[in-house]
């Protein structure tokens, strides 16, 4: 089931709880929730608890990594996230601008979305998420 996310929920993920509960109430056989940005991903535990789901009822997945998402992974409500490594997304363009301006170097290509984070590897990146590096 695809659920369009209204602008108010995209802006303030805390407003998504009634929508999540209604979607799952109307479709109780859904077994996976995939969100499309960090605010919604961080809210998955809240949404799932409000819908009466335990950690084994619905697989939670999403994008980005933050301290609340680390908590969600550790609690079992979020199973996997794609860490887009936002520090690199912000840092590398500045490096590229400098290299192009100073030395005329061509553009760099860097894949910043290749890291899957789960309970198996969360301990390695959790301190970096707390510092907003990962």
Q: How would you describe each model-predicted region?
A:
Residues 1-134:
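A residue-level marker of the well-folded mature domains of exported/periplasmic proteins
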């Amino acid at each position: 089931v695809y659920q369009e996310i209204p602008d108010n929920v995209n802006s303030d993920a805390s407003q998504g709880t009634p929508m999540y509960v209604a979607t799952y109430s109307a479709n109780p056989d859904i077994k996976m929730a995939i969100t499309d940005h960090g605010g919604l991903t961080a809210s998955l535990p809240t949404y799932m608890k409000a819908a009466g789901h335990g950690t084994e009822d619905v697989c939670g997945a999403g994008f980005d990594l933050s301290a609340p998402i680390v908590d969600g992974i550790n609690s079992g409500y979020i199973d996997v996230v794609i860490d887009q490594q936002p520090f690199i997304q912000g840092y590398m363009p500045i490096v590229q601008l400098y290299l192009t301006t100073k030395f005329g170097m061509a553009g760099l290509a860097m894949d910043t979305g290749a890291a899957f984070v789960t309970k198996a590897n969360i301990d390695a990146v959790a301190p970096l998420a707390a510092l907003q590096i990962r």
